[in-house]
Amino acid sequence: MEACSRKRRRRRAYTTSTTGYAAVFFCGIFVFAQFGISSSALFAPDHYPSLPRKAGHFHEMASFQAPKATVSFTGQRREEENRDEVYKDDKRLVHTGPNPLHN
């Protein structure tokens, strides 16, 4: 009878110590997570002393606005038949001969 009560005490002590270790472990994770979140808030983009030159203009623009186009076409549009004259390329020409990929 006495041996049985010793086992219960050991088992109870083991269970409470394991539960205590687990509670301390999860509290430690919680504290470090909160510390990480609060320290990352210090380095938010609006808190940097100076932005890189390329990123400066990008961050000033609202996220829903598209960037302005820098290329504008003001000349006359070319007709379809004039394109072949400009590039001097016949699109229907099929090159024949040995295939260089198959030796």
Curated annotation (Swiss-Prot):
Q: Where is this region: Disordered?
A: 71-103
Example GO biological process term? regulation of cell differentiation
Write out the similarity annotation: Belongs to the CLV3/ESR signal peptide family.
On the tree of life, the source organism's domain of life is Eukaryota
Signal sequence coordinates: 1-21
This protein's name: CLAVATA3/ESR (CLE)-related protein 16
Residue ranges spanning the membrane: these are: none
Where does the record place Basic and acidic residues bias? 76-93
Q: Which residues carry this modification: Hydroxyproline?
A: 98
Q: Which InterPro entries match?
A: CLE_plant
In the UniProt record, does the keyword Signal occur? yes
What glycosylation sites does the entry record? 98
Gene Ontology CC terms, in alphabetical order:
apoplast
- In the UniProt record, the gene name given for this protein reads CLE16
Keywords (alphabetical) are: Developmental protein, Differentiation, Glycoprotein, Hydroxylation, Secreted, Signal
Coiled-coil regions, chain positions: none
Q: Does the keyword Isomerase apply?
A: no
Please give the PANTHER family that the UniProt record associates with this protein. Answer: CLAVATA3/ESR (CLE)-RELATED PROTEIN 22, CLAVATA3_ESR (CLE)-RELATED PROTEIN 16
